[in-house]
Amino acid sequence: MPRVSVIIPAYNAAATIAGTVESVIAQTVQDFEIICVDDGSTDATVAIVKKFGDRVRLIEQANSGPAAGRNNGARHSSGEYLAFLDADDVWMPQFLERSVGALDADPALSLAYCNCALADSEGVPIDTSLVGHGFDHAPLLNELLTRLWPIMPSATLVRRTAYDACGGYRDALKGASFRFEDTDFCIKMREQGPFAYIDEPLITWRFAWFPKQLKRLPDYSKALHVFEAYLQERYGVSAAPLVDARMRAPRSILATIGLKALRDGDRPRARAAFARAIKVDPYRLKNYLRWIRTWLPDRLAQSLSGKSSRRARSDRAYQE
């Protein structure tokens, strides 16, 4: 029986799935199984996964979303620890070594997670660290309920007993499509035991924000209200700050992408990112000013930038 089951939910991931699987195969710890759950892909994802032969076990399901895919993979797995790796993210070679070591060192831990490097949907680096000041420690439960903690699914290693006890990922809530399964899962896992934080960027997390997703923002807001009602029912008004932070997250990440592009001199890319951030939150004046800067001559833009460039790291997701 392998110590670790690596579960990769994939939907139309033909462009990235090979690199994701190869990053698992390259781990310094080799006591694992890889399970890829294809979520009804219509591209070449399945064909690419099959090229890995018996290194990857393929499970195919009707399109049901990543939460259902993770749970399905867990049901077919046998490892003591579970790792949920998204099909467009990649691990550094030491990810499993560090994460397994953390859980082995303290049987009370329910989950270990690490810092992340951040890239856009095309793999272009945005930042070397997702976790900023004030978030560089394992959270208490009340911190998870009041702040949007930067814990990416791909950056976690989960103790199976804790996963089973919390019921896994939630893929529906009161009949509504559930959009915040990652946040919900972390809260449920923290109820099972403390976390360990590894202060190294051992994965590259790709933030995929495409123009077509802007059309889904009304659904995002509707789902957020459902999530808010659930949190209030379970935890009371103490979780209200988490809902506010969850709403700000897409805007903050887009602003980070725009600032990085602006520093790199890529004005069209910066302009597009700020424009999307404005659509996400039209009441955020700062992003209008940033968008205007992309049209100005360099010298004038720099004179108007104020502290923006120096605050680029603090503008990343979860902190703006």
Predicted regions and their residues:
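Cell-envelope/extracellular polymer assembly enzymes that use nucleotide-activated donors
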Residues: 2-5, 23, 33, 184
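Short aromatic/hydrophobic "clamp" motif used to bind/position activated sugar donors
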Residues: 82
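Conserved donor NDP-sugar-binding/catalytic core segment of glycosyltransferases
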Residues: 94-127
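C-terminal subregions of glycosyltransferases and related glycan-biosynthesis enzymes
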Residues: 1, 150, 160, 178, ...
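Short, well-formed alpha-helical segments that are part of the catalytic scaffolds
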Residues: 12-26
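Conserved nucleotide-sugar donor-binding catalytic segment
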Residues: 132-218
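A conserved acidic beta->alpha catalytic loop
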Residues: 23, 30, 38-47, 63-64, ...
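Glycine-rich, basic loop-to-helix element that forms the pyrophosphate-binding segment
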Residues: 61-77, 98
